[in-house]
């Protein structure tokens, strides 16, 4: 007999607990048309999937560990109370903040019939007027009024079914520049002080990263150019015509090696070629 009693007790516990692999993802119509309606009509549900608690005595981050089921969404039955005795405004203040509605009640339909109302709320830390918005949200479901003669007190103190969840914030993607755009680069050219043609200054140039055109060619250092060219071509000063005439004799084509002009030119060439 004792074995049969234990077997029956184990069977009842299995019926009251969610089965392995069970996931609770009800729709708005199912929450209103089945779960909340059975709660209001005092009809029992064999599995306690939705607990009855006063959610306003908890902060939202404490509610997941109180819930019976749920991974990212948690459900609770809660009697909505009034903020003041003679007011229809509900009291949604918690220990650390308050719930604030984001709009009016939206009707929920099933087969063209309104089965209830849905309100969205956001949780704020702090007091009203100085609160900080959080990612915690709530969907509050309630049944529609049975008659048009319900008093404000009856409309305020009603059973609600609350869905608590944390909003997932999207992460911003990093800004990626197109292939034809380059980052901003600051170039610094320090001019040499050994040449009298150069001035003592530092020039800065910024390449615009948003420009589609290639950067303009950079001006070359005149001092650098004159020394590079000097190895390949001699630098002539004075009257070019007189210098050319001194290279030729009357017979044409032969250099005059013993002329004064040739001596001057030879000293210039020897000075450039010596290491």
UniProtKB/Swiss-Prot annotation:
This is Transcription factor JUNGBRUNNEN 1. The gene is JUB1. Disruption phenotype: Precocious senescence and lowered abiotic stress tolerance. The NAC domain includes a DNA-binding domain and a dimerization domain. Residues 115-173 bind DNA. Residues 1-24, 191-219 are annotated as: Disordered. Residues 198-211 have a biased composition (Basic and acidic residues). It comes from Arabidopsis thaliana (Mouse-ear cress). Disulfide bonds: none annotated. Expressed in roots, root caps, cotyledons, tips and margin of young leaves, senescent regions of fully expanded leaves and floral tissues, including old sepals, petals, staments, mature anthers and pollen grains. Not detected in the abscission zone of open flowers, emerging lateral roots and root meristematic zones. Induction: Up-regulated by H(2)O(2), paraquat, ozone, 3-aminotriazole and salt stress. Transcription factor that binds to the 5'- RRYGCCGT-3' consensus core sequence. Central longevity regulator. Negative regulator of leaf senescence. Modulates cellular H(2)O(2) levels and enhances tolerance to various abiotic stresses through the regulation of DREB2A. It is found in: Nucleus. GO terms for molecular function: DNA binding; DNA-binding transcription factor activity. It comes from the Eukaryota. Its main location: nucleus. Residues 18-167 form the NAC domain. GO terms for biological process: anthocyanin-containing compound biosynthetic process; camalexin biosynthetic process; hyperosmotic salinity response; leaf senescence; negative regulation of leaf senescence; proline biosynthetic process; regulation of reactive oxygen species metabolic process; trehalose biosynthetic process.
């Amino acid at each position: 007999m004792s074995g049969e009693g234990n077997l029956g007790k184990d069977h009842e516990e299995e019926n009251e607990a969610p089965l392995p692999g069970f996931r609770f993802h009800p729709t708005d119509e199912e929450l209103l048309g089945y779960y909340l309606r059975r709660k209001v009509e005092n009809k029992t549900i064999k599995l306690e999937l939705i607990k009855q608690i006063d959610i306003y005595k908890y902060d939202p981050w404490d509610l997941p560990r109180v819930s019976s089921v749920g991974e990212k969404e948690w459900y609770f039955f809660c009697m909505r109370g009034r903020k003041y005795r003679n007011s229809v405004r509900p009291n949604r203040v918690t220990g650390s903040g308050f719930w604030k509605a984001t709009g009016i009640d939206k009707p929920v339909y099933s087969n063209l019939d309104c089965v209830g109302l849905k309100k969205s709320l956001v949780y704020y830390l702090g007091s009203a007027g100085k609160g900080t918005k959080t990612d915690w949200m709530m969907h509050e479901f309630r049944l529609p009024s049975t008659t048009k003669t319900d008093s404000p007190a009856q409309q305020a103190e009603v059973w609600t079914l609350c869905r608590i969840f944390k909003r997932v914030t999207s992460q911003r993607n990093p800004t990626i520049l197109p292939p034809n755009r380059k980052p901003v680069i600051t170039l610094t050219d320090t001019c040499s002080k050994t040449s009298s043609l150069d001035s003592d200054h530092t020039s800065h140039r910024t390449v615009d990263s948003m420009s589609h055109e290639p950067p303009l060619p950079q001006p070359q250092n005149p001092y650098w150019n004159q020394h590079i060219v000097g190895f390949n071509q001699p630098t002539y000063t004075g009257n070019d015509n007189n210098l050319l005439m001194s290279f030729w004799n009357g017979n044409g084509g032969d250099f005059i090696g013993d002329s004064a002009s040739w001596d001057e030119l030879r000293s210039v060439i020897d000075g450039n070629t010596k290491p």
